[in-house]
């Protein structure tokens, strides 16, 4: 006669507790994700530039030499937004620039920077996006030239200009510098605008943060060569209040970044960003 296994109440509770603990550990922190979403500037690209537009419901236009891209609806609406996505779908989009169906995203979506976001931060961002009120506003289709509509060509572009993978700390750098590097390189994706690009839209990595162009206008050099007249205090105040040391104001695009993103960061994170910019190689404009 076979003996049946006997489970004590303590054993059952232990198994249940362990399963709960594993599940809880995998859940993101929506409150922390809210801060990360500000640091990543999500609202700027995913909210239409008009008064009363629903936040994160898409419609914001991004004009490029390849056509006009529109930020999609990223609210949890199951039809218009990303309500049917899984957490894995979201992480794949951010880390690898791929849609749930496996197709490439165009690199107007800055996954070339977001790929560096650490996985626990991605989970927190996902938890925050799921907590948003859903909007049924449909995403607008991109308006691109015929040749640039072919998503399969992005595979070649990725081979040339995209290296997926989470941020790796700078060896020998201080904790503050590494925190600043993470904010600048990954979440803040500063290089997307402040690094020059070639005719294919690929970033010129040897000129990282040495200045670029947006809408045909020059974007400043953020290396020590471009910031040599700015004190640390000047930089931090600019990122909060939007005023240069000589009393001037930034472009409309940068003013929006300050309003939506950098002014929402903690003083410690702002100081870390400045600390990182100070240790970059000085590159001429």
What are these regions (language model features)?
Residues 2-13:
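Bacterial N-terminal signal peptides that target proteins for export
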Residues 11-21:
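Bacterial N-terminal signal peptides
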Residues 137-154:
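Extended, well-folded interaction surfaces typified by the phenylalanyl-tRNA synthetase beta subunit core
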Residues 101-103, 191, 200-201, 229, ...:
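Substrate-binding/catalytic groove segments of enzymes
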Residues 88, 97, 102-128:
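Membrane-embedded segments
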Residues 33, 39-49, 90, 125, ...:
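The canonical Cys-X-X-Cys-His
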Residues 22-38, 155-185:
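Electrostatic cytochrome c docking/interface patches
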Residues 61-92, 112-122, 207-246, 256-270:
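Electron-transfer interface patches adjacent to heme c in soluble/periplasmic c-type cytochromes
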């Amino acid at each position: 006669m076979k003996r049946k296994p006997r489970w004590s109440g303590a054993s059952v509770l232990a198994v249940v507790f362990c399963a709960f603990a594993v599940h809880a550990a995998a859940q993101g922190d929506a409150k922390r994700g809210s801060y990360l979403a500000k640091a990543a500037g999500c609202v700027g690209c995913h909210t239409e530039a008009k008064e009363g537009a629903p936040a994160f419901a898409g419609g914001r236009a991004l004009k490029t030499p390849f056509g006009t891209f529109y930020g999609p609806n990223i609210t949890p609406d199951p039809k218009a937004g990303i309500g049917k996505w899984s957490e894995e779908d979201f992480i794949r989009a951010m880390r690898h620039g791929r849609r749930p169906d496996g197709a490439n995203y165009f690199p107007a979506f800055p996954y070339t920077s977001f790929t560096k976001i650490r996985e626990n931060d991605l989970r927190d961002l996902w938890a925050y996006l799921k907590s948003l009120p859903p909007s049924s506003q449909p995403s607008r289709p991109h308006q691109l030239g015929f040749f640039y509509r072919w998503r399969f060509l992005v595979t070649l572009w990725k081979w040339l200009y995209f290296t997926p993978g989470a941020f790796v700390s700078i060896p020998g750098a201080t904790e503050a510098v590494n925190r600043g590097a993470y904010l600048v390189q990954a979440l803040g994706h500063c290089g997307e605008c402040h690094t020059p690009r070639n005719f294919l839209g690929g970033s010129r990595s040897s000129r990282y943060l040495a200045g670029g162009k947006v809408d045909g206008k020059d974007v400043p050099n953020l290396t020590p060569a471009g910031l040599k007249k700015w004190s640390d205090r000047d930089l931090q105040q600019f990122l909060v209040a939007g005023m240069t040391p000589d009393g001037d104001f930034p472009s409309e695009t940068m003013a929006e970044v300050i309003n939506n993103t950098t002014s929402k960061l903690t003083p410690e994170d702002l100081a870390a960003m400045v600390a990182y910019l100070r240790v970059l190689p000085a590159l001429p404009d």
